[in-house]
Amino acid sequence: MDAAVPGGNKIGTTGAPIVPTKDNAYEYLVDLGVLLDESDTPIDGRFVVVPAWFHGLLLKDERFIKTGSRRADSTLANGQVGEAAGFTILKSNNVPNTTGAKYKILAGHSIATTYAEQIVDLQTYQPEKRFGDAVKGLHVYGAKVVRPENLAVLIASKS
């Protein structure tokens, strides 16, 4: 999906990936949000998919764990950031990367993609070892990026 993202909506390159730290990881989320703002992406429903190490950087940021607020206390208790910079943060070990480096952290909105599914070639038959009738069919599905301007990518490597 990151291949569909326009060049203007990318931070970093595969040749020169960004190396975030606990002090600036949140700022990169803000920068992704600004790119989506400039592309007229709706604010409600934004998401970002981050690898575990990037999620860990956010957990080390004082802004998320400073005590005194209910959200910070919750972050300390369960280790989940949840939301930041207008994004719902999704942690995944399946973030596209090149041999453990150059992670492509994807941010966007659900309006950027579409999903379709259909059951075709439906047939009834009689199972060999059972009494009665059964149905079988071919389930086809697929997804496609239809509004690439509503996606943004941060290409980052671990420090």
Please state what every model-predicted region is.
Residues 20, 61-159:
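Sequence/fold signature of self-assembling virion shell proteins
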Residues 22-63:
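Hydrophobic, aromatic-enriched interface-forming segments
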Residues 1-14, 37-52, 89, 120, ...:
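Long, contiguous amphipathic alpha-helices that act as assembly "spine/axial" helices in icosahedral shell
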Residues 1-38, 155-159:
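Alpha-helical scaffold segments that mediate packing/assembly in large oligomeric complexes
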